[in-house]
């Protein structure tokens, strides 16, 4: 039996659940921008939460429970229980909450958890928000309005903390190669040249950067790669992305294939679909959420986890990627975005 043979089948929700409000902060770099210097995690979470409340036409007195997501709050914020520190900011003092952290999957699990609480009938209105401040880190014993830049050594420790370190398993999860393992398999399985892989990854970088430059909430990415190329005396984005400014950091990965670190937060509010039209004329019904955990000690872990989660929702809803009008994918690594699109048909 492989670890894929034991995947449970999703069951329909006990009652339908819909999103009635969404909110987000601008995505900033606190230490680089004097206009937001001194902002802290609580303010960012509250900004997104209040924005979602405003979108739904509710306030903290209406929301019954909130969920706080942050990937690794111990290293960026020196907070062990960050959910405890935002209730006063959003008008929910005394109400229930909890915190969760699942690295790149934190946002997805935040949606799943909020939906489960409402679908079960335990609560009628739940807010779920996620906040990240990875561009800088807090001091261990100072107020959180004072921050500092991390070092490469600190970030290496953080990345190592995402790996299984049982006995010799740690040696099988070396970054960034654990993220490239599925891509290398895909390339060899389909007889793709390294030049074609590079062209695909470069095009993804260019398109993602262009989308970020157009996004009004992005305050950190104002220039496309074409503009950066011109600024540095180069003729094209392709030339810039194959220069010293974008070195290889793996077999296929370059610097631009990795995330752009910034500070920000986003939130949603969910309630039973039967109540949703009381708050909005365009609720977003959630049909199902797949979930699979495959840690980096397993070869091609991202590929198997994505396949598993997609298979769950496909079997539950009868829908495939071909039925979708819009498809959004995690692009913490470019190859993750490509993997999701390939897997979800």
Name every feature range the model reports, one short phrase each.
Residues 196-199, 203, 207-264:
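Polyanion-binding loop/helix "lid" in catalytic or ligand-binding cores
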Residues 98-132, 173-221, 268-274:
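Active-site-proximal alpha-helical scaffold in enzymes
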Residues 60-70, 96-102, 126-131, 198-206, ...:
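Beta-strand segments within the central parallel beta-sheet cores of soluble alpha/beta enzyme folds
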Residues 2-42, 156-165, 169, 188-192, ...:
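Condensing-enzyme catalytic core mediating Claisen C-C bond formation in acyl metabolism
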Residues 41-57, 82, 110, 179-182, ...:
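Short, well-ordered amphipathic alpha-helical segments that serve as non-catalytic structural scaffolds
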Residues 13, 73-129, 133-177, 228, ...:
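Conserved catalytic cysteine-centered active-site region
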């Amino acid at each position: 039996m492989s670890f894929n043979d034991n995947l449970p089948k999703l069951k329909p929700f006990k009652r339908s659940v819909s999103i009635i409000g969404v909110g987000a902060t601008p995505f900033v770099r606190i230490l680089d921008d004097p206009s937001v210097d001194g902002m802290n995690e609580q303010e960012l979470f509250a900004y997104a939460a209040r924005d979602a409340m405003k979108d739904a036409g509710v306030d903290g007195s209406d929301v019954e429970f909130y969920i706080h997501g942050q990937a690794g709050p111990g290293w960026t914020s020196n907070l062990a229980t960050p959910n405890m520190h935002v209730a006063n900011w959003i008008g929910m003092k005394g109400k229930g909450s909890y915190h969760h952290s699942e690295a790149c999957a934190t946002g997805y699990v935040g949606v799943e958890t909020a939906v489960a609480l409402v679908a079960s009938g335990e609560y009628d209105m739940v807010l779920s928000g996620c906040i990240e401040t990875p561009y800088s880190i807090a001091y261990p014993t100072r107020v959180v309005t004072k921050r500092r830049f991390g070092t490469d050594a600190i970030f290496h420790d953080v990345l190592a903390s995402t790996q299984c370190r049982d006995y010799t398993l740690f040696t099988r999860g070396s970054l960034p190669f654990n993220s490239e393992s599925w891509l290398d398999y895909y390339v060899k399985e389909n007889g793709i040249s390294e030049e074609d892989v590079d062209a695909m990854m470069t095009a993804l970088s260019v398109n993602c950067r262009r989308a970020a430059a157009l996004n009004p909430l992005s305050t950190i990415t104002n220039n496309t790669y074409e503009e950066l190329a011109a600024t540095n005396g180069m003729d094209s984005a392709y030339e810039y992305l194959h220069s010293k400014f974008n070195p290889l950091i793996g077999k296929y990965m370059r610097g631009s294939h990795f995330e752009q670190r910034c500070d920000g937060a986003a939130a949603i509010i969910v309630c039973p679909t039967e109540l949703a039209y009381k708050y909005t004329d365009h609720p977003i019904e959630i049909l199902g959420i797949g979930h699979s955990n495959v840690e980096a000690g397993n070869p091609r872990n991202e590929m198997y986890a994505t396949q598993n989660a997609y298979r769950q929702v496909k079997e539950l809803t009868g829908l495939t990627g071909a039925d979708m009008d819009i498809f959004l994918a995690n692009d913490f690594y470019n190859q993750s975005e490509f993997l999701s699109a390939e897997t979800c048909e």
